[in-house]
Amino acid sequence: MADDQLNEKDLNAEEAAAVDNGARVQELEEQLAAAKDQSLRVAAEAQNSIRRAEQEVDKARKFALEKFSSDLLPVIDSLELALAHSSADDEHVKQIREGVELTLKMFQDTLKRYNLEAVDPHGQPFNPEHHQAMAMQENAEVEPNSVLNVFQKGYLLNGRLLRPAMVVVSKAPAAPQPSIDEKA
């Protein structure tokens, strides 16, 4: 009988230990799942941080190029103005003009390598996203809202507007006002 009681006590102790072990296993599995979840979150956050850092570096690079390019645009404007106001027939300025033409060509080629392109909209429809209207002029020969004259070229850097083109836009001629005789 003492053996039965002893075996029963051992059996109860083993059952209690098994229940404790089951609870402990479940607790450890929950901790493992939480640790895996935390690990995935940390990995995702690290990946997002790397992506954000790369985007910031790209933006900084583009911004630096944008500022530099903006600072160069007046130089291009000056070279183009020099060519526009010099005569190709004048022997005194012929060599200087050729030098300015070559300098401007090299400058434009360099800007193309860095995806800086000119917007010269002469004759095209007015686009408020790329053009800045400086004046409106009546003209019956072209469509209304067409660019008649370009005061200053615009520029795009990597497809993004760096400087709008300053333009004169056409408008339809106004209907003639009736004279006093026509009103009567």
Swiss-Prot record:
Gene3D superfamilies: 3.90.20.20, Head domain of nucleotide exchange factor GrpE (2.30.22.10). GO terms for cellular component: cytosol. It is found in: Cytoplasm. Keywords: Chaperone, Cytoplasm, Stress response. Signal peptide: none annotated. GO terms for molecular function: adenyl-nucleotide exchange factor activity; protein homodimerization activity; protein-folding chaperone binding; unfolded protein binding. The keyword Chaperone applies. It holds the Pfam family GrpE. Belongs to the GrpE family. Participates actively in the response to hyperosmotic and heat shock by preventing the aggregation of stress-denatured proteins, in association with DnaK and GrpE. It is the nucleotide exchange factor for DnaK and may function as a thermosensor. Unfolded proteins bind initially to DnaJ; upon interaction with the DnaJ-bound protein, DnaK hydrolyzes its bound ATP, resulting in the formation of a stable complex. GrpE releases ADP from DnaK; ATP binding to DnaK triggers the release of the substrate protein, thus completing the reaction cycle. Homodimer. This is Protein GrpE. It comes from Pseudomonas putida (strain GB-1). The gene is grpE.
